[in-house]
UniProtKB/Swiss-Prot annotation:
Biased composition (Acidic residues): 917-926, 951-961, 1001-1037, 1046-1060
Stretches with biased composition (Basic and acidic residues): 674-684, 975-987, 1249-1263, 1287-1297, 1464-1476, 1616-1635, 1680-1693, 1730-1746
LIM zinc-binding domain sequence ranges: 772-834
Localisation: Cytoplasm; Cytoplasm, Cytoskeleton; Nucleus
Calponin-homology (CH) domain ranges (all copies): 521-627
Cofactor(s) needed for function: FAD
Identification of the protein by name: Protein-methionine sulfoxide oxidase mical3a
Keyword Repressor recorded: no
The entry's keywords: Actin-binding, Coiled coil, Cytoplasm, Cytoskeleton, Exocytosis, FAD, Flavoprotein, LIM domain, Metal-binding, Monooxygenase, NADP, Nucleus, Oxidoreductase, Zinc
The organism of origin for this protein: Danio rerio
Length: 1994
């Protein structure tokens, strides 16, 4: 074919490369096909030459990007099974459907060398629904080059992808392999080979539409159905797995990829299954009642929820309650608007109102992408393949995907099993091509298919890299010959009579499962004989029948006594006391064996003869239980061992569960599991319930006992739950509750209704007593459907919670003896609340009850309306359950045969839409344009869509976008597209300005892969903010370009404020004030412009903007936005003008924000708190106004105050100030700071700035306000996050404020305490400002005027911030004593923003090291630094108080105070300033912490714990000793490492062995982060206790600091440690310039390292660590800078570096680009560092040396991971390729920057990520297991309902109740036995009855086992959550805790121990049962399988 056009090498080659890129990047189906066609045309290739196409393409396309893809595909194609593409060389395959499974099958067949033709009826991929991916699926797709096509593919912890993206990816691979793909072609049917084969041998062909299509002429050997339909290919019988009514709603919202959105936690597969409280809150708040909800962030925000019918009716989504599901969910019966608002409300609530704008994406009809469908029934094909043979031609027919096996979508089973089936089918085609006989091929395929429904992520082979088409590589214990060829004869269709049967059965499923198991008691004679043998020899017992012989009760007692003589004293029984004897037997059987009674003793004594059917049911359970047990013989003197064995063998899991439940219930708010369990059993065996008499009383008492405690527990738990819920950590009990609630819920209400319908008790036979009347509805209860609990008998569907109307399960309910009512466990505590409390629930309950009658009433309609067409369906298909309510066949059956629920829904949608209006399909491009506009706008270049390079810019972008696209929600799509184009235009420029955006995005993507899920969410946002920082970070960038001026950098560093902004946004979202939105929009516009103007500061601008909108009303936001941009611009300018004036302005700007914030807090603070912490802070509108004036005054003060420094400040702020909005902008900034989750840290930063400003002017009040606001906001945020520490934080804040005044006074020195306190408030607000100032300062290192004190202040503030982040670190930062104080403050800060604490802690440690360095300098300079009030020099002496404050501060948000301490004028030297800068960096670190908070959040539920930890450790330890300061600092640095260890130890102490590992890891991480010595000590002890491994770690830590294991004593602990720390400090002191840095580096780094490692352990921490690292470096840099005050510019870069380091480190964690950023961050710190290093190589060497030490110690503490991470980070940082100038600067800075700190941070991050990922995986596994159990329970329930229906039919026939006829779907059963009418003992009917009883018993047992598994899972989940909470609590020193807290800790520990105990006993019980019933289980499994009860299909 020649090279044709390619000969013009240059152009041709480039053209081909461009075409290839276009193909790879195509985002639509049509676009992909078009690009591929162009590429082939250009290269002169013909895809239909499938055998050589791929090889020719490869040879002609010599392009490096393509080669990477070829390498992937070649590796896959090299599998030996493919035989180099010749395995199926002559096979022609037709695949119907281009869904993921069809494409995947095509790819496998392509590799095998077959000719593959794929038909797709549409030409657009429009399904945004998101699929959860199992690990092997991810690996499989990566192996096909997924990341080459879709860079964001499963980056970091992401494990999901939209169907659309997956289809595009696979489509491209298929095209490259030469697979023919035809779109707009619909398969109509198969054309058999003609009979006349002599003239022309024509094989099987397909009939397709359009008829002229060439595919009509092709012949095929294999046809595979992959279109998701059930009847495209005939001959496949279906099994139906019916759960209770399940209505799913899916919704896709536009994802604008803003930082705010990125921060919102995903809700994984079944995360909320365990969080019952969340669903209750949702219901009470909105009236929406869900079973579960899943949220994935992808191209869209994808939500899928299972809604309860009742709530859909109440909310008006469903208009009329029809029994038939299809009618129920038909378009005519659904109010579309109500559905949209329902979905939006649920999505909004479940994400804590943090998604800024929920605008629906559009589907391919241009309608909002919301769908509601019924997945009550899941279908599976009974066989996977068949062979059709006609006229000498064989055709292999197979199914894959949903057609084969419908998935349980929340668990990702669809795509995972779909891919497995695709490979299995390819393997079958391979065998077919190899000439195996059709029966052998089919037998092997069916053997493999039997495994498919059971596959889970856990039981597939773990060696994913070895997966191939060969099934043995994928299924661990597979037998390819399980099914024998003669068993699949029916699958070989030769065209004879069999077809008819196959097709018929396709429609009608046999309704009665066949029993394969030995029909043990099918004959009553067998049961009778067994009973006679067992009761032989007992006095007064003569069993001759199954009725009268049992009336006295002696026979029952004898039966029990035979096996358990210890339970009944048979000799004492009186034959005449019939009632007592029977009641005793019933009670004992229920209590000990879990066999529910079928009546009461009283009833038994009254009836003439017991009911035979009931007795058969009851006695058969004894038979099932004891038939394989050998009775204990005549000798009753059993040895204890024998007795134990006997008891074990006769112990029922249910009875055990019930007992266990009791204790557990008490500890948890769960209910007495006792009853539950029994009931559970009872559930299975409806009739078995507790007897009325004693057993009932006992049970009641027990219930009361359980329940009361359970109430108390419930209350206690409620607290935990809220925290947990906030953190998405659901408690086990929640899990159990929810599980149970779900299990119970909506149970088959319909069915009952139906049953009851006909069963109104006309006249009960004489022998029927109270047990035949339903306790709830007073109607007749038949034996088979009887359930009993607490001595009451009822229908399953009548068993509802009295409060909420949820259907209960016997295994999980609560009973109130006093009012005789039943409750679900979650609502038991409401039972006394009465109607008053009912509010929402009541309606639900009523409806629940009303439901039945309603259903009944409706049923006729249903029958009439839907019935006609559908009635034709066979009974089997209708299923009683389906039809139950009406008794009419379900109309939906016909349709159901065709497609999956979603598909049917879509079809319905289309039909109805076409009727309503002419609907044109929207082109895929338009869809993408609308739905993915934000992605396209912002991140076209960056696949990730999170451009780290322009975090500010991006935020701006996003906000603007939010303003624009967000409005698209209601806009018609065409307008939307236009709008989008405009918006795109707007945002793009900004993005362009931020050159980094692109590169960063890429990097982010890579790094994301490494990042944790937690990081991920935040990562995107952080990335944005971080990237700019990174730019700034690079010293080169900073120094080199005005844009990146230090000041600017710092401003951008405000980006940390990005995180804040995000947090704020979140808060704002929560607050959700329209003004904010409007403002956002307006300000966004401004911001955009600004951003465009200053690409360097885009991030900052954006952050401010975002924050501002979030924080406050439109005006403030607008102002803020404006200011921000100005500031950014100025920043660069600031560098230019470092004159005092500029500094003043800068300061002014900063203070104004503070001041506005402050002011705002005064008035708005309360509001803010109410609204949301974040919102509040930004909200202060009044503040904004006020701040303006204060700002101006401040500038005046500032100008004089900070000459060099002020210039720095000015740098960024002078420009800002110029515009009137400047002040506004500063408030905005301030707001951003508070917004930061790690608000506390940010606040300190603000404080520093504020202090400076305050000194300059009187913005102190504002500061105070700001601080207050900040605290309030942070508290609010915390609250919203579910962090308990909020309140504490608040308290801390107040106290902190008190102390802060000192720092503040430092800044205004003359301020009074009140002023100070006010200042403090502003400090909070000021934090963001401080950040700016610090940045500027660092950048210029000039603010000597306010300078030293200001610089110090700044340092302190930042330190304080840092402390907030990591108390210890911050402490370290300030002067020796100061640093102690700082620690205190820091600790306080953490309380203020609990989520960030853990990360903070680490950063704190890191910072501490830096601080130490700083401190040394400070100490040298002045010992004053100790004074808590950094701002006031006099206060400097206050340092001693600082130590005090430390403790005090710890509780209070002293962070501000600490910052003041840091501010000590002592540091007045430039070094001091440098320190300030560091502190600022730390502040920045803190800011990132906001994001971190999220991480932390994820990491550990209790934010409060983290905060508390911070409080204590840092404060008390470091602050105390001034001289020891160095030592203390060093120790603290070491300590963080050690704390990790000790913490670990502590954790292990409390945890069970299982939890030990995780606990240890977490402990370690925490330790590192822990600031306080006490805490550390405790942790150290804990760790040592915890494990030997921990000891090793501790040793390492010791090595690092030469500290003994006792961390708590870290100061004393090891003199070596102290020495090292001291030395480091001294070093710092020695060389304020270089040494300072050097020391700072060593101690700082060591600390950093330890912090890092701890951070890596904890997700959140890792991010912070990164920040911390940079801050340390920054501090060093700062010192160096201070030393060389003259090099202001360098200082600013350093400052920037610090800030960036903080931010970029944070982001880095998140993304690879971020990784670069990280290096940048390090470079940031190093940048400052770098600059310093440049200035003084000495610094660098010392840094390195220090680093070495540090890394060692860190390693010890952090463990090798840190070192590894460090090195990897280093290499990563060095090697990171960023294509932009900024990137270059960044990389340059990175190289320099990549100090051990940075590396450590990175390593830590990585370690943390790994740990977080591990924890998340464990949680996901639990969730998946819970989901499966839930699904199985639902199926069991459905099966039971069907059994009950049949049982009722049989019972009625046996009793001769003729009204039976009209009601049952089982008339066929009775038709068989018409002759038996009225004959009680009709043998056939009795036989049927026995069968049913046996099946029911099997189900009951199965169900009880499931409940035990659920219970075990619940306990496991509970334990892990308790461990987490405990770990967090223990991170705080005991002396910092109140008595109550200590008591709570003890309580948690006790509860955990109890849980562990219960788990052990459960596990033991299960194990015993396993062994004992191994054989029996095989039987049971066989029975279940034979009945189609395979419960693993879900």
């Amino acid at each position: 074919m020649g090279d044709g056009g390619v000969n013009a090498v240059g152009e041709g080659v480039n053209q081909s490369h461009m075409l290839f890129d276009r193909f790879v990047q195509a985002t639509t189906c049509k676009g992909t096909l078009k690009a591929f066609q162009e590429l082939c045309d250009f290269l002169e290739l013909k895809p239909n030459e499938y055998r050589v196409f791929y090889h020719k393409l490869k040879s002609k396309l010599n392009y490096w990007k393509a080669k990477a893809l070829w390498a992937k595909l070649d590796k896959r194609a090299s599998h030996k099974e493919y035989k180099k593409g010749r395995a199926c060389a002559n096979t022609k395959c037709l695949i119907i459907g281009a869904g993921p499974c069809g494409l995947r099958t095509a790819i496998e067949l392509g590799f095998l060398g077959a000719k593959v033709v794929l038909l797709e009826k549409r030409d657009a991929f429009s399904r945004n629904n998101v699929l959860h991916l199992w690990p092997f699926t991810i690996q499989d797709l990566r192996g096909l080059g997924a990341k080459k096509f879709y860079g964001k593919f499963c980056a970091g912890a992401i494990d999901h992808i939209s169907i659309r993206q997956l289809q595009l990816m696979l489509l491209k691979v298929a095209l490259l392999l030469g697979i023919e793909i035809h779109v707009n072609v619909e398969f109509k049917g198969l054309i058999e080979p003609p009979e006349d084969q002599e003239n022309e041998r024509i094989g099987w062909r397909a009939e397709v539409h359009p008829r002229t299509h060439p595919v009509n002429e092709l012949e095929f050997d294999v046809i595979i159905g992959a279109d998701g339909r059930r009847n495209t290919l005939s001959g496949f019988r279906r099994k139906e797995f019916r759960g209770k009514l399940a209505i799913a709603i899916t919704a896709n919202f536009i994802n604008r990829n803003t930082t705010a959105e990125a921060k919102v936690e995903e809700i994984s597969g079944v995360a909320f299954i365990f969080n019952q409280k969340f669903f209750q809150d949702l219901r009470e708040a909105t009236g929406i009642d869900l079973e579960n909800i899943v949220y994935y962030k992808d191209d869209t925000h994808y939500f899928v929820m299972t809604a309860k019918k009742q709530s859909l009716l109440e909310k008006g989504v469903i208009l009329h309650d029809y029994a038939d599901t299809e009618m129920l969910l038909s378009r005519a019966n659904v109010d579309q608007k109500a559905l949209l608002s329902y979905a939006r409300e649920a999505a909004d609530f479940s994400t804590n109102h943090q998604l800024p704008k929920l605008d629906f994406a559009i589907n391919h009809y241009g309608q909002p992408d919301v769908a509601m469908f019924d997945f009550t029934c899941m279908y599976a094909s009974e066989n996977a393949a068949l062979v059709r043979q006609r006229n000498g031609h064989k055709l292999l027919v197979a199914l894959v995907g949903d057609s084969l096996l419908e998935p349980f979508w929340p668990m990702g089973t669809g795509i995972a099993r779909g891919f497995l089936a695709a490979m299995d089918s390819a393997w079958m085609v391979r065998s077919w091509a190899h000439g195996s006989s059709p029966l052998e091929v089919l037998a092997e395929r069916e053997s493999i298919y039997r495994l498919l429904p059971q596959t889970t992520p856990e039981n597939v082979s773990k060696n994913f890299s070895q997966y191939s088409v060969d099934p043995t590589t994928r299924y661990p214990n597979i037998s390819l010959h399980q099914v024998r060829p003669n068993q699949v004869r029916h699958l070989l269709d030769t065209g004879e009579t069999r077809d008819l049967r196959v097709d018929l059965e396709n429609v009608v499923n046999s309704s009665t499962p066949k029993l394969t198991r030995n029909e043990s008691i099918v004959r009553s004679s067998k049961l009778l004989n067994w009973c006679q043998r067992q009761t032989e020899g007992y006095r007064g017992v003569s069993v001759s029948d199954l009725t009268t012989s049992w009336k006295s009760g002696l026979a029952l007692c004898a039966l029990i006594h035979r096996y358990r003589p210890d339970l009944i004293d048979f000799e004492s029984l009186d034959e005449k006391d019939v009632e007592k004897n029977n009641q005793l037997a019933f009670d004992v059987a229920e209590r000990e064996f879990g066999i529910s009674p079928i009546m009461t003793g009283k009833e038994m004594s009254v009836v003439v003869e017991p009911d035979k059917l009931s007795m058969v049911m009851y006695l058969s359970q004894f038979y099932e239980m004891f038939k394989d047990t050998v009775p204990p013989g005549e000798n009753q003197n059993l040895s204890p061992e024998e007795k134990a064995a006997l008891i074990a063998s006769t112990k029922s899991p249910i009875s055990f569960l019930s007992k266990l439940g009791q204790s557990i219930a008490i500890s948890r708010k769960r209910n007495p599991k006792d009853k539950k369990e029994k009931e559970l059993d009872g559930l299975g065996k409806r009739r078995k319930t507790s007897q009325a008499g004693q057993s009932e009383d006992e049970e009641l008492q027990r219930a009361n006992r359980d329940d009361r405690p359970s109430i108390a527990t419930a209350l206690a738990e409620r607290k935990i739950d809220s925290a947990a819920a906030a953190n998405n950590n659901n408690k086990v009990k929640s899990m159990a509750t929810q599980l149970l609630a779900k299990f119970e819920e909506n149970a088959p209400t319909q069915s009952t209704g139906l049953k009851r319908q006909g069963s109104f008790r006309k006249e009960f036979p004489q022998n029927i007593g109270g047990s035949d009347v339903c306790f709830f509805c007073r109607k007749r209860v038949y034996v088979m459907e009887r359930l009993s609990a607490e001595g009451k008998f009822f229908h399953r569907s009548c068993f509802k919670c009295d409060y909420c109307g949820t259907t209960l399960r016997l295994s999980s309910y609560a009973f109130d003896v006093e009012d005789g009512k039943f409750y679900c466990k979650p609502h038991y505590c409401y039972r006394l609340s009465g109607v008053a409390q009912r509010k929402r629930p009541a309606p639900a309950a009523a409806p629940a009850n009303a439901k039945e009658p309603q259903v009944l009433a409706v049923s006729p309609n249903t029958v009439d309306a839907p019935g006609q067409a559908i009635t034709t369906q066979t009974p089997a298909e209708r299923r009683p359950s389906e039809t139950e309510v009406n008794g009419v066949t379900e109309p939906s059956v016909a349709k159901r045969l065709k497609g999956t629920p979603e598909r049917i829904e879509l079809e319905n949608y289309r039909l109805s839409m076409m009727r309503e209006e002419e609907l044109e399909e929207v082109p895929e491009e338009t869809l993408a344009e609308h739905n993915l506009s934000s992605v396209l706008d912002k991140a076209t270049d960056i696949e990730e869509g999170s451009s780290s390079s322009e975090s500010d810019m991006e935020e701006e972008d996003e906000d603007a976008e939010a303003a624009g696209p967000s409005d698209l929600g209601g806009v018609p799509w065409k307008e939307a597209v236009e709008l989008h184009a405009k918006l795109k235009g707007e945002s793009d420029p900004g993005a362009d300005d931020d050159g980094l955006h692109d590169g960063d995005g890429e990097m982010d993507e890579d790094e994301e892969e490494e990042e944790d899920e937690e990081d991920e969410d935040e990562e995107e946002e952080e990335e944005s903010s971080e990237e700019p920082c990174e730019e700034d970070d690079d010293p080169e960038a900073e120094a080199g370009s005005p844009d990146f001026e230090p000041g600017t950098e710092i401003d951008q560093e405000d980006i940390p404020s990005d995180a804040e902004a995000e947090a704020r946004s979140r808060c704002i979202d929560e607050v959700v004030t329209l003004p904010v939105d409007n403002d956002k929009t307006e300000s966004q516009g401004q911001v955009f412009n600004t951003a465009e103007k200053t690409s360097a500061n885009p991030r900052e601008l954006i952050v401010d903007v975002v924050l501002s909108p979030i924080q406050k009303p439109a005006l403030p936001i607008e102002e803020v936005h404006e200011v921000s941009p100005v500031v950014l611009v100025k920043s660069p300018g600031a560098r230019f003008f470092p004159e005092p004036y500029l500094p003043d302005k800068v300061k002014q700007n900063i203070p104004p924000p503070q001041s506005p914030d402050v002011k705002t807090p005064h008035s708005p603070v309360a509001q803010i708190i109410a609204l949301s912490p974040i919102c509040s802070q930004p909200v202060p509108q009044p503040g904004t106004a006020s701040p303006k004036s204060p700002v101006q005054p401040q500038p005046c003060a500032c100008s004089p105050t900070g000459n060099p420094l002020s210039p720095i400040c000015t740098q960024s702020q002078p420009c800002n100030e110029p515009p009137s909005p400047l002040s506004t902008s500063s408030p905005v900034r301030t707001q951003p700071v508070p917004a930061v989750t790690s608000t506390p840290l940010a606040k300190p930063a603000s404080e520093n700035r504020t202090n400076e400003h305050l000194k300059d002017s009187t913005p102190e009040l504002k500061k105070t306000d700001l601080i207050e606001e900040f605290w309030l906001k942070s508290a609010e945020i915390r609250k919203s996050l579910g962090l308990t520490p909020l309140e504490r934080s608040k308290t801390a804040v107040e106290k902190s404020i008190v102390k802060t005044p000192t720092p503040e006074s430092s800044s205004p020195k003359s301020y009074t305490p009140e002023d100070l306190s006010e200042e403090q408030k502003p400090t909070f607000t000021g934090r963001s400002i401080i950040r700016r100032i610090n940045i500027t300062l660092e950048g210029q290192v000039i603010s000597p005027v306010e300078p030293k004190s200001n610089g110090s202040e700044k340092k302190d503030l930042s330190s304080s911030s840092g402390l907030g982040l990591n108390g210890s670190v911050t402490t370290s930062q300030t002067a020796a004593s100061d640093s102690y104080n700082n620690s205190d403050s820091t600790m306080l800060t953490p309380p203020s923003s609990p989520p960030p604490p853990p990360p903070r802690e680490e950063p704190a440690c890191l910072q501490n090291k830096k601080s130490q360095v700083s401190w040394d300098n400070l100490l040298e300079g002045t010992e004053e630094p100790k004074s808590e009030t950094m701002p006031i020099k006099p206060r400097t002496p206050v340092s001693p108080p600082q130590p005090k404050q430390k403790p005090v501060t710890a509780p209070v948000p002293t962070p501000r105070t600490n910052p003041p301490v840091v501010m000590r004028v002592k540091e007045p030297n430039k070094p001091r300033r440098e320190e300030v800068r560091k502190s600022f960096v730390e502040c920045v670190d803190e800011i990132p912490f906001a994001d971190d908070v999220e991480d932390t959040y994820d990491d550990r539920t209790p934010d409060a714990s983290g905060l508390e930890k911070f409080y204590t450790p840092p404060t008390s330890k470091v602050n105390r000793d001034k001289p020891p300061l160095h030592l203390a600092l060093a120790m603290e640095n070491g300590k963080p490492n050690i704390p990790g260890v000790s913490r670990t130890a502590k954790g292990s102490q409390h945890f069970s062995p299982e939890a030990k590992e995780i606990a240890e890891e977490r402990m370690r991480a925490r330790e590192k982060s822990v600031k306080s010595q006490a805490l550390k000590d405790a942790m150290a002890k804990q760790l040592t206790k915890m494990k030997d491994s921990e000891v090793a770690k501790g040793a390492v830590a010791k090595v690092a600091w030469d500290i003994p294991e006792t961390k708590g004593k870290s100061k004393k602990q090891s003199k070596a440690q102290k020495d090292s720390a001291v030395k480091a400090l001294e070093s710092k002191k020695q060389a304020d310039t270089l040494p300072d840095r050097f020391f700072s580096t060593p101690s700082s780094k060591a600390l950093d390292s330890s912090v890092t490692s701890s951070e890596s352990s904890t997700g959140g921490k890792s991010k912070k660590r990164s920040s911390l690292f940079s801050p340390r470096k920054n501090k060093k840099e700062k010192k160096a800078k201070n030393e060389r005050l003259s090099s202001t510019e360098e200082t600013p870069p350093k400052h920037k570096s610090l800030w960036k380091a903080v931010f970029s480190g944070y982001k880095k964690d998140k993304k690879k680009k971020d990784d670069k950023s990280c290096p940048s961050t390090p470079s940031s710190s190093t940048t400052g560092d770098s600059g310093k290093k440049k200035d003084s190589p000495l610094d660098r060497s010392s840094d390195l040396r220090l680093r070495r030490n540090l890394s060692f110690s860190e390693d010890s503490d952090l463990s090798c991971d840190d070192v590894l991470e460090r090195s990897s980070q280093k290499s990563k940082g060095d090697s990171v390729y960023v294509p932009h100038a900024l990137a270059f600067k960044r990389s340059y800075a990175t190289k320099k920057t990549y100090t051990e700190e940075e590396l450590n941070a990175k390593l830590t991050r990585r370690v943390q990520k790994a740990a977080r990922r591990q924890a998340k995986q464990e949680e996901l596994k639990r969730l998946h297991r819970a989901q499966m159990i839930q699904r199985q329970l639902e199926q069991v329930e459905e099966k039971q309902r069907q059994l009950e229906e049949r049982g009722v039919a049989v019972e009625k026939a046996l009793r001769g109740e003729a009204d039976y006829w009209g009601e049952s779907n089982y008339s066929e059963i009775l038709d068989l036995h018409l002759g038996g009418m009225g004959k009680k003992d009709d043998p056939k009917l009795m036989q049927e009855w026995f069968k049913l009883v046996q099946e029911k018993n099997a189900l009951v047992r199965y169900e009880s086992e499931l409940m035990i598994f659920a219970r075990e899972l619940e306990l496991e989940d509970r334990q892990s959550r308790l461990q987490q909470e405990l770990r967090e609590r223990m991170a705080i020193d005991d002396h910092l805790k109140t008595e109550e807290e200590l008591a709570e800790e003890k309580q948690i520990l006790n509860e955990m121990l109890e849980v562990v105990e219960q788990r052990d006993s459960l596990v033991a019980l299960l194990e015993e049962q396993r062994l004992r019933e191994k054989e029996e289980d095989k039987d049971l499994e066989a029975v279940m399988l034979s009945k189609g009860f395979n419960l693993n299909w879900a």
